[in-house]
Amino acid sequence: MIKSSVGGNEGKSKFFDQEKRLERTWNNSNWGKQGIISPVDGDMKIIDIELEKKMTKLEHENKLMKNALYELSRMENNDYAAWVIKVLFGEVAHGAK
């Protein structure tokens, strides 16, 4: 984990570690660009690896954005960040009214 002596950077190292973990998931793949045959709804279907990678990356970026908004709303007591969380995710931010 990256440590920083400057205040306020603690959250950045946590997000960086999550991105490295995502990269390792796909770099260890034995399948390359081939599809994987997998049961989906009882039928055998070919799953496109490239599409799965893109979808996983989008889901991961969404999760990082959501975590960053939660941290911003919590640490800065930012009403705008709390409003964005409520509109996008339908949830109330931690500590928000």
UniProtKB/Swiss-Prot annotation:
User: Per the record, GO CC terms?
Assistant: host cell membrane; membrane
The compartments listed are: Host membrane
Q: What InterPro entries does its record include?
A: Phage_phi-29_Gp1
Q: Which domain of life is it from?
A: Viruses
Lyase found in the keyword field: no
Q: Which UniProt keywords apply?
A: Coiled coil, DNA replication, Early protein, Host membrane, Membrane, RNA-binding, Viral DNA replication
| Its membrane topology | Peripheral membrane protein
Q: Which GO terms describe its biological process?
A: DNA replication; viral DNA genome replication
What Gene Ontology terms describe what this protein does at the molecular function level? RNA binding
Chief place where the protein resides: host cell
The reply on keyword ATP-binding is no
Q: Which residues form a coiled coil?
A: 49-78
State the similarity comment: Belongs to the phi29likevirus DNA replication protein 1 family.
Domain remarks in the entry?
The hydrophobic C-terminus is involved in the association with the host membrane. The coiled coil region is involved assembly into protofilament sheet structures.
Summarize the subunit comment: Homomultimer. Self-associates into large complexes forming long filamentous structures. Interacts (via N-terminus) with the primer terminal protein.
Q: What does this protein do?
A: Protein that assembles into highly ordered structures and provides a specific site for viral DNA replication. Probably anchors the viral DNA replisome to the host membrane.
Which protein, by its recorded name, is this?
A: DNA replication protein 1
Species annotation: Bacillus phage PZA
Gene name of the record: 1C
